[in-house]
């Protein structure tokens, strides 16, 4: 799965998402938008934020589709082995599981806005972020330039992102792991105290559990004025 995220009018809160699907060998392709998110055991209605949905082949010709449930679409491939799905997502929910877009930042929980092909969840995913040059990108996924790489859809779903020109960050290390603290918002942090406290609880948790599963881990914080 190859995703591209862009936007034209950030004050309107609409994110443009393109999804390139390759190696299609069926007459129809289904796309699913999740109705769940990590750490929350209840159904969500992320599909209400989909404002536009279009499908094209490599020649730019429109393909037929229909919505078969609240979170699922079915596309007629018409013999095409490669298609591009384009849709808008309304990103105006600033909380631990939402997405937000304005003139100052892009905040994304991929689980709420990224569609996938059922049965192909374990394929590698890339996400190209088309953001201004002065934006930093905070995310736990490995990246090359502005392209993020996930081993599969579940890896992507577990990796929230903030992109902004005003992000600040500091890093610290344990014996085998590196940790980065990212902060978005108007704040003047006491980095010396924060790094000391984070390192203490990190080392204690690793001691208790015996290991930490990630070599590189990122904490993301939104400091809000309300």
Language-model features: locations:
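Surface-exposed beta-strand/loop patches in extracellular or lumenal glycoproteins
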Residues: 15, 20-47, 115-132
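Non-catalytic architectural context of zinc metalloproteases
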Residues: 45-51, 56, 61-201, 207-215
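Ser/Thr- and Asn-enriched, surface-exposed coil loops between beta-strands
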Residues: 11-13, 25-27, 67-71
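Active-site acid/base region of carbohydrate-active enzymes
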Residues: 218
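Catalytic zinc-binding patch centered on the HExxH motif and its immediate surroundings
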Residues: 225-226
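N-terminal, polar/Ser/Thr-rich
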Residues: 1-10
